[in-house]
């Protein structure tokens, strides 16, 4: 995201009155002493034109400190002068005195509430203060004041993106490029919106347009000199999601050139490195991926908090022999469960003693399962992000296990069910979930939703209704996203075939694991319950749309057949193209689940 420049069509009022004077050659000079003497002598309420021009001269020469000092002496004598308040606000803002700037702009607004420039400056202040809702509303006011100006429309779109309202930002960005077809940042942000809304084809087309016109767009004000390579960086996502692997390889080469050119500038290349890592992992090119993946936390907008420690971050596995390393959670609970399956292999290869900070919902189960590891919930200052503990030599975010082991598809030889369930709880659920046939656990959604997750990780219960209706099996509900309306709408015949465990399915992983261990098969989207089932050794049937995520190490992504997820034992994951229509997708997924149920039936009969 970028901050806004001063509107380039703003002209000071004094210059509008008289353009004939050459201020640079004007013998009139201004000092604080001059202002005080002149003020005391004349007691003016309307300052002389020469003085006004000299104030603007200081502004255009970026002499903000001197200018503000002068204005603070003049303003008490001219309290109804809009222009002075505006200049004081601009000077304060440029000196990063944001509260003072807001005070002056508000006073200017009192005299001219419909002035575009004052409203625009106030919107910029809200933007800089990360008060995105106020920024969006104020930019909206500006866009009404000057409908033909693209800057406030873009400002409003940017604020909405900061609020994660990509659907609201999308039409505004389209409007921006209609007004100003060469405004590169709008195309860039529009592509990001499309990606966040899982509209990958639209994003791909936008990026292709930018690449095709990079010679022209690259000359526009505010454009990056590396526009073409940056577009290819974003295009890695769309190519992988749309299955355009040949185009993806072209974008990989362009993004690599950018990273190599600026190899010493980690901050500049961090996002490109991350996209290169994911693309290579999705293509199964793990050798080229893990070095880039290590730098994921250098990204400005990386979603996981970058925690702070008094000990250094581990940079290679060889330095950990005989040392104590703190491994801390960085991603979702499903990823944590999967990575826990690599802990023993990591300890074997590194020779390190491990302290593991993990989601508090997993602490008891992981402690029972990995007795040679100290397991605890994270504890750190929520403002500074500094850890409360110092009992280790090195720290590392949890997915660094992957960057150190550098796994490929052969890693599945090191993976085995590892989660040890509470046996008493498991026996209790075995008695409660009665069935003469299969016990099939199912889930269809996650509580955390956005457009991308809805496409990749969310189903409607109606799909499971079709499976349950003609089934003689007992279906065990593992989903906690039911609404009362959805639950009450279930046909009673179907509801009679479903066992609803009376537990907190979202937070009580001890009870959830005990329920899962009594299932013959778990059917769900690509989510945490699937990961926990795999850690228990329960067969799972799942799916992905587009290219698999990086924890699958690119297994068979160029083949639409079923593949096995290496980190989840006995996991069957069906891959579907992103462009499948909903009906075609659901019909194919239904068939996939039916096949896995048939396999479970045969396994039970053996």
Predicted region positions:
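Alpha-helical solenoid repeat scaffolds of the TPR/TPR-like class and their adjacent stem/linker regions
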Residues: 1-521, 526-530, 534-606
């Amino acid at each position: 995201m970028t901050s806004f420049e001063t509107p380039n069509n703003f002209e000071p009022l004094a210059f509008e009155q008289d353009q004939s004077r050459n201020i640079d050659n004007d013998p009139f000079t201004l000092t604080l002493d001059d202002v005080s003497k002149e003020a005391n002598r004349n007691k003016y309420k309307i300052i002389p034109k020469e003085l006004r021009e000299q104030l603007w001269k200081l502004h255009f020469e970026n002499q903000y400190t001197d200018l503000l000092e002068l204005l603070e002496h003049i303003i008490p004598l001219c309290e109804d002068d809009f222009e002075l308040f505006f200049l004081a606000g601009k000077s304060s803002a440029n000196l990063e005195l944001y509260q003072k700037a807001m005070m002056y702009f508000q006073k200017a607004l009192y005299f001219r509430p419909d002035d575009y420039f004052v409203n625009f400056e106030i919107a910029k202040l809200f933007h800089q203060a990360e008060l995105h809702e106020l920024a969006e509303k104020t930019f909206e006011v500006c866009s009404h004041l000057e409908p033909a100006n693209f800057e406030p429309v873009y400002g409003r779109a940017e604020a909405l993106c900061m609020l994660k309202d990509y659907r609201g930002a999308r039409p505004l960005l389209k409007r921006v490029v209609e007004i100003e077809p060469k405004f590169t940042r709008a195309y860039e942000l529009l592509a990001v919106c499309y990606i966040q809304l899982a509209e990958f084809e639209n994003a791909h087309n936008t990026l292709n347009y930018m690449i095709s016109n990079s010679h022209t767009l690259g000359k526009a004000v505010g454009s990056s000199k590396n526009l073409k390579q940056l577009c290819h960086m974003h295009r890695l996502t769309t190519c992988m999601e749309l299955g355009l692997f040949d185009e993806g390889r072209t974008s990989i080469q362009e993004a690599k050139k950018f990273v190599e050119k600026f190899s010493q500038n980690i901050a500049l290349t961090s996002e490109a490195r991350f996209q290169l890592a994911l693309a290579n992992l999705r293509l199964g090119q793990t050798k080229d991926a893990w070095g880039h993946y290590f730098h994921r936390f250098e990204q400005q907008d990386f979603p996981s908090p970058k925690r702070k420690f008094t000990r250094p971050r581990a940079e290679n596995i060889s330095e950990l022999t005989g040392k104590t390393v703190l491994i801390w959670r960085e991603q979702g609970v499903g990823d944590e469960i999967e990575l826990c399956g690599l802990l023993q292999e990591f300890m074997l290869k590194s020779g390190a003693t491990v302290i593991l900070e993990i989601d508090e919902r997993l602490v008891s189960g992981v402690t029972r399962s990995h007795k040679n590891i100290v397991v605890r919930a994270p504890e750190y200052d929520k403002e500074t992000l500094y850890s409360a503990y110092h009992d280790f030599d090195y720290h590392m975010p949890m997915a660094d296990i992957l960057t150190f082991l550098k796994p490929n598809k052969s890693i599945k030889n090191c993976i085995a069910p590892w989660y040890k369930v509470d046996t008493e709880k498991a026996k209790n659920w075995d008695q409660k979930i009665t069935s003469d046939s299969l016990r099939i656990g199912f889930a269809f959604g996650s509580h955390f939703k956005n457009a991308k997750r809805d496409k990749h990780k969310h189903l409607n219960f109606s799909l499971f209704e079709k499976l349950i209706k003609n089934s003689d099996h007992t279906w065990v509900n593992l989903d906690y996203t039911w609404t009362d309306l959805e639950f009450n709408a279930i046909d009673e015949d179907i509801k009679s075939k479903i066992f609803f465990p009376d537990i907190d399915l979202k937070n009580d992983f001890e009870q959830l694991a005990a329920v899962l261990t009594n299932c013959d098969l778990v059917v769900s989207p690509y989510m945490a319950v699937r990961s926990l089932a795999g850690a228990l050794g329960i067969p799972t049937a799942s799916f992905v749309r587009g290219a698999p995520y990086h924890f699958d190490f690119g297994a068979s992504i160029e083949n639409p057949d079923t593949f096995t997820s290496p980190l989840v034992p006995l996991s069957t994951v069906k891959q579907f193209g992103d462009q499948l229509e909903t009906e075609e997708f659901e019909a194919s997924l239904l068939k996939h689940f039916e096949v896995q149920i048939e396999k479970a039936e045969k396994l039970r009969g053996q």
